[in-house]
């Protein structure tokens, strides 16, 4: 048996090829799996459950079917932090706190999206702190749908422009933040996404940090079992 982790699919109506690849993954890669964890940024943007795009509603139906036989867990990312209980229930996903500790085949493991570890990106961390306030999210949800969509598009555009100007170091995790989380959670394994830099890192010769990759050019999935870990890519099918 094994547990699967994915993240950073950034699904959108503009890239339905990624949605198709994800559907194939759900159809073919879940044999003998104990659970599926989605570590955030399942969608490129999410402005509210009441504005879910048709492709997202179709995906929710697919996930709901999968969840009848396989538990699906979801941690919010920086792109889909407004995804709520309404859509999660429709998709059969169980929402988890942004930092969650689980026992994985005898190894205590902390899982998260990963944006909280990029502490050198001060501008983003200020925005992240603002969006963490329930009152801010509530005020946003009260805005007219067109206004919410416009704000989301603006944030997305600014983020893409800003990221092009930021250094590699600033956009990666900060080692001190990683070490602090290991100490705080008393774990020896960490699994996250966000940076789009899939790798398995050994920290201080004692802990393991695994980064799942994005799905822009190919899929990425981490399989964890009692025998160890396997981080692999999933090439998209070409027609």
From Swiss-Prot:
Alphabetized, the UniProt keywords read: Cell inner membrane, Cell membrane, Hydrolase, Lipid A biosynthesis, Lipid biosynthesis, Lipid metabolism, Manganese, Membrane, Metal-binding
Kind of enzyme, top EC level?
A: hydrolase
> What is its cofactor?
Mn(2+)
Q: Which domain of life is it from?
A: Bacteria
Keyword Cell inner membrane present in the record's keywords: the answer is yes
Which GO BP terms sit in this record? lipid A biosynthetic process
EC number annotated for this UniProt entry: 3.6.1.54
Q: Which GO terms describe its molecular function?
A: manganese ion binding; UDP-2,3-diacylglucosamine hydrolase activity
* Pathway where this protein functions: Glycolipid biosynthesis; lipid IV(A) biosynthesis; lipid IV(A) from (3R)-3-hydroxytetradecanoyl-[acyl-carrier-protein] and UDP-N-acetyl-alpha-D-glucosamine: step 4/6
One family name in Pfam for this protein = Metallophos
Q: Which reaction does it catalyse?
A: UDP-2-N,3-O-bis[(3R)-3-hydroxytetradecanoyl]-alpha-D-glucosamine + H2O = 2-N,3-O-bis[(3R)-3-hydroxytetradecanoyl]-alpha-D-glucosaminyl 1-phosphate + UMP + 2 H(+)
Any idea what job this protein has?
Hydrolyzes the pyrophosphate bond of UDP-2,3-diacylglucosamine to yield 2,3-diacylglucosamine 1-phosphate (lipid X) and UMP by catalyzing the attack of water at the alpha-P atom. Involved in the biosynthesis of lipid A, a phosphorylated glycolipid that anchors the lipopolysaccharide to the outer membrane of the cell.
Q: Which PANTHER family match?
A: UDP-2,3-DIACYLGLUCOSAMINE HYDROLASE, UDP-2,3-DIACYLGLUCOSAMINE HYDROLASE-RELATED
Please give the family membership noted in the entry: Belongs to the LpxH family.
Q: What is this protein called?
A: UDP-2,3-diacylglucosamine hydrolase
Organism listed in the record: Shewanella oneidensis (strain ATCC 700550 / JCM 31522 / CIP 106686 / LMG 19005 / NCIMB 14063 / MR-1)
């Amino acid at each position: 048996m094994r547990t699967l982790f994915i993240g950073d699919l950034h699904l959108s109506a503009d890239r339905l090829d990624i949605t198709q690849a994800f559907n194939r993954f759900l159809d073919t890669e879940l044999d003998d799996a104990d659970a599926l964890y989605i570590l955030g940024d399942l969608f490129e943007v999410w402005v509210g459950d009441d504005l879910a795009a048709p492709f997202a509603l179709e995906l929710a139906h697919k996930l709901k079917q999968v969840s009848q036989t396989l538990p699906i867990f979801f941690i919010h990312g920086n792109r889909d932090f407004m995804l709520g209980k309404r859509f999660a229930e429709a998709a059969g996903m169980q929402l988890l706190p942004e930092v969650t500790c689980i026992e994985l085949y005898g190894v205590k493991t902390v899982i998260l999206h990963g944006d909280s570890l990029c502490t050198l990106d001060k501008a983003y961390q200020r925005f992240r702190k603002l969006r963490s306030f329930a009152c801010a999210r509530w005020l946003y949800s009260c805005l007219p749908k067109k206004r919410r969509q416009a704000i989301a598009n603006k944030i997305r555009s600014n983020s893409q422009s800003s990221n092009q100007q930021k250094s590699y170091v600033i956009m990666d995790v900060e080692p001190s933040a990683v070490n602090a989380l290991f100490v705080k959670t008393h774990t020896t394994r960490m699994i996250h996404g966000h940076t789009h830099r899939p790798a398995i890192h050994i920290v201080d010769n004692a802990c393991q940090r695994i980064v799942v990759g994005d799905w822009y050019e190919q899929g990425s999935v981490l399989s964890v079992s009692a025998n160890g870990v396997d981080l692999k890519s999933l090439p998209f099918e070409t027609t």
